[in-house]
């Protein structure tokens, strides 16, 4: 049993030009590419992203990679909570992470910043604690957005300790809300796609609008709001990476750095997990198409 995370239709080159399905199947242990040859119109209609299936097939080696030649495949109807069990899970239980998030929110002593953060997290809590942080590359698993945020908050702790001039309230608030726009950018927690709003606007602009709207709803105005908006808008660090402005305050620079560190280290972790000791991983797109080496130690 597995969940379909990707499916495309192809045509064979022969005279009959029959249809086939390229399917990527996933369970909690990983993914495998699969082929369903001579797919019927009903199968093409039936098998889609997010569908849980039960089947069997033969595992073959294709260009050095494992591939499954599907012999039989049938859909299973289950709810989203059960579907989530087929996805990679975070290394920390969700309930533990939820308590950690609450602890960090309470570290924000600036009442205006706290009100905005609390208001947005409360309003979008279910999505925030269940959505992945991305559809691929980094933290692309159940509750990945929450886990990514907490890892960043722990990195923020260390920067605040070393660089005592940083505004801890602003940095904590920026970390917690930096990806809040992803609760609207993605379609849901299970095998998410980009929403229309997500594709057209993007999570940075969405998140900025959410902060601005919450501040207006709470009748909060002034420099703190501008600074928090700046944190959201600049957190990708460069305009070519999607930020309309560059970091102009140290807290925004710190946010950019720790976001990048955590995302990239997660990509290294994923690559090592799927690689045998003493060998190299496949090329990692998010790491400039590098191959990652896994030592024998």
Predicted regions and their residues:
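N-terminal intrinsically disordered, cationic/polar leader segments
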Residues: 256, 280-288, 295-297
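Extended, charge-rich, solvent-exposed interface segments
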Residues: 67-132, 206
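OB-fold single-stranded nucleic acid-binding module
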Residues: 7-19, 30-85
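Short, acidic/hydrophobic/Gly-rich beta-strand patch recurrent on exposed beta strands
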Residues: 22-27, 188
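Active-site flanking loop/helix segments enriched in acidic
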Residues: 126-147, 191-195
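Divalent metal-dependent catalytic cores for phosphoryl transfer on phosphate-bearing substrates
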Residues: 137-138, 158-275
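Helix-hairpin-helix/helix-loop-helix acidic hairpins
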Residues: 150-153, 160
């Amino acid at each position: 049993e597995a969940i379909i995370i990707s499916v495309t239709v192809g045509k064979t080159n022969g005279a009959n030009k029959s249809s086939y399905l390229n399917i990527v199947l996933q369970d909690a242990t990983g993914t495998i590419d699969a082929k369903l040859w001579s797919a019927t119109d009903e199968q093409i209609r039936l098998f889609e992203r997010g569908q849980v299936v039960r089947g069997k097939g033969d595992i073959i080696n294709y260009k050095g990679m494992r591939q499954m030649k599907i012999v039989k495949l049938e859909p299973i109807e289950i709810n989203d909570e059960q579907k989530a069990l087929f996805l990679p899970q975070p290394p920390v239980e969700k309930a533990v992470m939820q308590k950690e998030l609450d602890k960090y929110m309470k570290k924000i002593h600036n009442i205006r910043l706290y009100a905005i953060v609390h208001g947005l997290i409360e309003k979008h809590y279910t999505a925030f604690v269940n959505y992945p942080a991305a559809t691929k590359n980094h933290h692309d698993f159940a509750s990945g957005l929450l886990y990514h945020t907490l890892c960043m908050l722990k990195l923020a702790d260390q920067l605040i300790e070393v660089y005592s001039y940083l505004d801890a309230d602003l940095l904590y608030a920026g970390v917690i809300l930096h990806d809040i726009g992803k609760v609207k950018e993605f379609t849901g927690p299970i095998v998410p796609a980009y929403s229309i709003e997500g594709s057209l606007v993007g999570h940075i602009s969405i998140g900025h609008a959410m902060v601005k709207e919450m501040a207006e709803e709470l009748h909060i105005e002034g420099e703190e709001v501008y600074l928090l908006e700046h944190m959201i808008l600049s957190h990708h660090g460069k305009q070519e990476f999607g930020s309309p402005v560059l970091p102009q305050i140290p807290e925004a620079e710190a946010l950019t750095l720790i976001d990048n560190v955590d995302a990239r280290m997660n990509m290294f972790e994923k690559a090592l997990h799927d690689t045998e000791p003493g060998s190299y991983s496949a090329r990692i797109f998010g790491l400039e198409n590098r191959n990652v080496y896994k030592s024998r130690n």
